[in-house]
């Protein structure tokens, strides 16, 4: 059983403190030093000297320290052993008179030891280290006077004990303030510790060992956040009230061999160590030694033009997400090499694997976490570290329900997150059409009170929906893109081999762990976590062989200018959260080019159907079409709640039954196009096929009837049909009838801007008709005689549509179906010179146009049509007339809907009038490529 460090000693008496104060450890001159024998000989004669033999004590004469270390050790009070451990600890302590130090195997890499009587130290390096500490101490004293607290600076150097190479600070130069008793005691405790300096070690490194082997600095705002395995001195640090700490490697400038570690310990918490790091680096350079690179300006501007071009859109995304969901902080990370940003963790080997924040593209909504953002700007990350590093390294969105559970090696900023109270975080790697092969990761921190698993899942789903609405040039990166042209070379480790394995294996363990309290899962977004990604996944199921149906479901628009690519090939797999709840995750995806604009998918695509079936859950299989019909009268969200599924899952279930839109939402709106009404009728038929209005009209025109001949009535038994079918008359209201008025047109135009001679209306049945039965009888007026077979043929062609629409007539007696471009002739005339738009306005609406970070507000004049509105927006933003722009308005369900014609503007006005909102929000996007049939607008369930 591993023995822990002895518990801290009881408080000292005044006599003991007086004795300590008289030890003479105070100013810059009171520095203990030693001779580093043979160092100059090794450096001059052997450029590639063996580090394991370099620090081996020689047979030189004993060193002459500035004060007697042995006497100081006996004067300083060390932690007393616990009861019952006196004899055991005394037996395990190394002998003072022995030639070497006997290491107790029970301590596994670090032991308590007394100060050796002989330490071989090379004078030249010793002198350089002593002068460097003098400069560090001089700067540190001025910082202490500014309120940064008192400091202890000590050096850890490697030495060989038996067959092991360890780091020790015993007998090495150090500096501390003589007035601070706690730091003096902590110095004595540190001299009794040894840490492994072997690169093959995977544990027992401690803070000095990690810095020495990893060759990168490490700092923390409070060492008390460490675990005992990460920081064996943590119990002593807690007792002596040690807080902040920073450790930097010391290199020989020519051979780049690591000579040791400089550790700075303070009695106050500290978040930003840039001044201390720069101070230590400059002091070492003055004595011809070197440490990590000095940090560059933390507000370094992005030098890549493509990144600069995307910053406004990123800021729109971050601002919208944080303001909508009350997130405290959102940050953008890109590779350091892309913005020429230097940092203290950089080296020539690791620079290309390091990522840092783009400070111009970060949004701090809660000022209390500003310090954490500054720490992130200062502390760069390697691939695999934290959710950001893992998102860069794996090309997968990464979510952590509690980032404070990461170890220091897994997430170097975990202590800072704990200090500022941050918990859950999610990172998503994206790419813009403006940035080419350059990638970035958006990191969002969930509200501090959002700790429940269900709350976090709901929050992630909401975040993804908001991102979908705001982004217009962003897309997810393909896996091959990360390997072929990304800034990282995945095959090469970013850190020494021992360190890379430690990080990645631990993270993989976290991702696959089940019911491990406090551990973090790499949650790849799913339909419940990322609905905008789920929309992409579902879209590919409708197409085949690289051709994707442009009519995407659930309000997702696939135009290239919006930036979201249609994806396929996601591999979903369940991942367990810390509490055992199940998340679904995706692994990878592939992009498919949109080659053709089609209005329906290929029903013969059996392979796609089989792939979808494999991913269906038990809940989805048990929800039948009949069960869905019972909930058509309400909203989609209400139906999802009643069925016990989330809205996104319900949308998938609807698509499996051939339902492309949720009917009730469109029934409630007035002024929709005939194309959209066709989709409502299509959606209730089932997966085998859909009823086309065009085929219904063809049956009318294929008969020998003419419009003039349809004057009489032919009544059919109620047992055959339950509703009336009669031609509509332009000046008569259509009540309780499924009507069709034809004039040489056999099909419905798909464009909302194209005029048509056909109109379709459906409303509630008067009570006078309901008195004769549960539903009215079918009647067709005509002037000529026709046999029963001809009538039967006509009825069969319309029976499918009637059977499904009957439910809507009965359950929603006050609802009215109308087309957007073709309203009922009894209420409106055809659209001419925007007369309908003028009639629809009872008063003028305000337009709030958004173009990047710019905003403008103006009144919508009654005489304006779509083209005039577009010209006004272009003029106000100073956009070139040659630049093609797309306009989108925010509808009553918080979806961005394309605005392409006068009919769309009429629809927009109706939506805002019905919601009593007098300000129309319009998003202005530059179009990358011409739109494909833009008049179709926003489609799909929502």
From Swiss-Prot:
A single GO cellular-component term on record: nucleus
Principal subcellular localization: nucleus
Compositional bias per record (Low complexity), positions renumbered to this chain: 743-753
Compositional bias ranges of the Pro residues kind: 1-11
Domain of life: Eukaryota
Protein task: Probable transcription factor.
Name recorded for this polypeptide: Protein NLP1
The organism of origin for this protein: Oryza sativa subsp. japonica (Rice)
């Amino acid at each position: 059983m591993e023995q822990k460090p002895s518990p801290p000693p009881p408080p000292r008496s005044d006599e003991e403190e007086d004795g300590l104060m008289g030890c003479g450890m105070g100013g810059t001159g009171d520095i203990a030093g030693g001779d580093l024998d043979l160092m100059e000989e090794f450096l001059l004669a052997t450029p590639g000297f063996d580090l394991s033999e370099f620090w081996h004590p020689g047979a030189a004469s004993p060193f002459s320290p500035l004060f007697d270390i042995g006497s100081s050790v006996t004067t300083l009070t060390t932690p007393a052993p616990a009861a019952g451990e006196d004899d055991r600890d005394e037996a395990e302590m190394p002998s003072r008179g022995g030639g070497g130090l006997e290491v107790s195997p029970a301590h596994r890499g670090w032991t308590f030891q007394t100060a050796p009587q002989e330490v071989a130290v090379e004078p030249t390096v010793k002198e350089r280290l002593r002068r460097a500490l003098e400069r560090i101490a001089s700067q540190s004293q001025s910082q202490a006077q500014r309120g940064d607290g008192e400091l202890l600076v000590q050096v850890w150097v490697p030495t060989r004990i038996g067959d092991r190479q360890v780091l020790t600070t015993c007998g090495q130069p150090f500096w501390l303030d003589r007035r601070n008793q706690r730091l003096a005691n902590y110095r004595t405790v540190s001299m009794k510790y040894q840490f492994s300096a072997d690169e093959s070690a995977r544990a027992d490194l401690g803070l000095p060992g990690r810095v020495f082997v990893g060759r990168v600095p490490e700092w923390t705002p409070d060492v008390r956040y460490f675990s005992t395995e990460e920081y064996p001195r943590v119990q002593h640090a807690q007792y002596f009230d040690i807080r902040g700490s920073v450790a930097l490697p010391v290199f020989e400038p020519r051979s780049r061999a690591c000579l040791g570690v400089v550790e700075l310990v303070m009695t106050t918490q500290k978040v930003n160590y840039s001044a201390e790091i720069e101070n230590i680096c400059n002091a070492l350079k003055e004595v011809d030694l070197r440490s990590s690179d000095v940090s560059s300006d933390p507000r370094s501007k992005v030098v890549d033009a493509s990144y600069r071009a995307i910053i406004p859109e990123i800021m729109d995304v971050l601002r919208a997400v944080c303001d909508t969901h009350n997130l405290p902080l959102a940050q953008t990370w890109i590779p350091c090499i892309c913005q020429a940003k230097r940092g203290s963790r950089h080296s020539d080997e690791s620079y290309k694997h390091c990522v840092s924040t783009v400070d111009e593209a970060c949004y701090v909504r809660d000022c209390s976490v500003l310090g954490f953002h500054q720490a992130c700007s200062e502390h760069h990350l390697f691939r695999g570290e934290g959710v950001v590093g893992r998102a860069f390294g794996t090309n997968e969105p990464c979510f952590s329900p509690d980032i404070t559970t990461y170890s220091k090696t897994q997430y170097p900023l975990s202590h800072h997150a704990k200090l500022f109270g941050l918990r859950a975080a999610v990172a998503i790697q994206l790419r813009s059409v403006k940035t080419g092969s350059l990638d970035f990761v958006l990191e969002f921190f969930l509200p501090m009170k959002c700790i429940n698993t269900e709350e976090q899942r709901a929050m992630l789903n909401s975040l993804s929906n908001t991102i979908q609405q705001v982004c217009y040039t962003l897309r997810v990166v393909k896996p091959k893109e990360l390997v072929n042209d990304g800034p990282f070379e995945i095959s090469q480790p970013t850190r020494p081999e021992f360190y890379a394995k430690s990080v990645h294996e631990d993270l993989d363990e976290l991702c696959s762990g089940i019911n491990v309290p406090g551990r973090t899962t790499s949650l790849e977004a799913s339909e419940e976590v990322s609905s905008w990604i789920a929309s992409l996944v579902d879209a590919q199921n409708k197409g085949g062989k690289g051709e994707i149906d442009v009519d995407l479901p659930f309000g997702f628009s696939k135009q290239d200018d919006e930036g979201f690519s249609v994806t396929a090939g996601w591999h979903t797999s369940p991942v367990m959260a810390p509490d055992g709840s199940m998340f679904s995750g995706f692994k990878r995806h592939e992009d498919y080019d949109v080659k053709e604009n089609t209005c329906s998918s290929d029903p013969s695509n059996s392979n796609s159907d089989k792939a979808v079936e494999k991913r269906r859950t038990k809940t989805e299989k048990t929800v039948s079409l009949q069960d869905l019909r019972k909930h058509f009268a309400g909203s989609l969200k209400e139906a999802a709640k009643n069925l016990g599924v989330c809205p996104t899952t319900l949308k998938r279930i609807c698509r499996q039954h051939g339902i492309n839109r949720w009917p009730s939402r469109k029934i409630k709106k007035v002024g929709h196009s005939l194309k959209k009404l066709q989709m409502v009728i299509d959606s209730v038929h089932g997966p085998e096929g859909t009823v086309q209005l065009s085929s219904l009209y063809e049956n009318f025109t294929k008969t020998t009837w003419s419009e003039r001949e349809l004057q009489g009535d032919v009544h059919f038994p109620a047992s055959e049909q339950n509703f009336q079918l009669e031609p509509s008359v332009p000046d008569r209201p259509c009540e309780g009838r499924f009507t069709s008025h034809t004039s040489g047109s056999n099909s419905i135009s798909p464009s909302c801007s194209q005029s048509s001679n056909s109109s379709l209306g459906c409303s509630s049945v008067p009570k006078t008709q309901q008195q004769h039965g549960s539903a009215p009888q079918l009647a067709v007026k005509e002037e000529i005689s026709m046999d029963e077979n001809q009538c039967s043929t006509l009825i069969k062609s319309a029976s499918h549509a009637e059977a499904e629409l009957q439910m809507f007539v009965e359950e929603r007696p006050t609802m009215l179906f109308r087309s957007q471009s073709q309203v009922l002739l009894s209420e409106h005339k055809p659209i001419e010179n925007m007369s309908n738009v003028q009639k629809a306005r009872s008063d003028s609406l305000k337009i709030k146009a958004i173009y990047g970070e710019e905003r403008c507000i103006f009144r919508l004049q009654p005489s304006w049509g779509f083209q005039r509105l577009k010209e006004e927006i272009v003029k106000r933003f100073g956009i070139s007339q040659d630049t093609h722009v797309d306009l989108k308005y925010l509808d009553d369900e918080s979806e961005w809907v394309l605005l392409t014609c006068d009919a769309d503007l009429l629809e927009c006005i109706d939506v805002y009038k019905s919601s009593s909102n007098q300000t129309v929000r319009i998003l202005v996007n530059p179009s990358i490529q011409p739109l494909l049939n833009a008049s179709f607008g926003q489609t799909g369930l929502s």
